[in-house]
Regions:
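Short aromatic-glycine-(Arg/Gly/Cys) micro-motifs in beta-strand/loop hairpins
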Residues: 7-19
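Structural detector for hydrophobic anchor residues on beta-strands
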Residues: 4, 15, 25-27
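A short, exposed loop/beta-hairpin motif centered on an aromatic-Gly-Thr core
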Residues: 23-33
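Proline-centered helix-kink/hinge sites
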Residues: 20-23, 58
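Active-site micro-motifs of SAM-dependent methyltransferase domains
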Residues: 13, 24, 45
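Short, charged, surface-exposed hinge/linker loops at domain edges
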Residues: 1-5, 37-71
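Short, surface-exposed helix/turn micro-motifs that flank interaction/cofactor sites
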Residues: 18, 36-37
């Protein structure tokens, strides 16, 4: 099992998500819950396709931190 960093963004019609360690792996939906489910499925499908094509599957390398600043 691997844990990939997923960036979620608000859009005009809902939410979008992408995985920096898996270029091209994206999802979008009208709700956050649906976007989470779709990006999970997209990651699994993306990795499965890479394995079928004999491509190396990248290990997760990115992480996110939130830093509080007083401005």
């Amino acid at each position: 099992m691997s844990i990939y960093t997923v960036f979620m963004e608000n859009t005009a019609t809902g939410y979008s998500a992408y995985v920096p360690d898996l270029p091209g792996c994206v999802a979008a939906a009208s709700t956050l819950d649906e976007t989470r489910q779709l990006i999970k499925e997209a990651i699994e499908f993306h990795i499965e396709g890479m394995r079928i094509n004999g491509e190396p599957v990248p290990e997760p390398t990115r992480f996110v931190e939130q830093i509080e600043v007083s401005v």
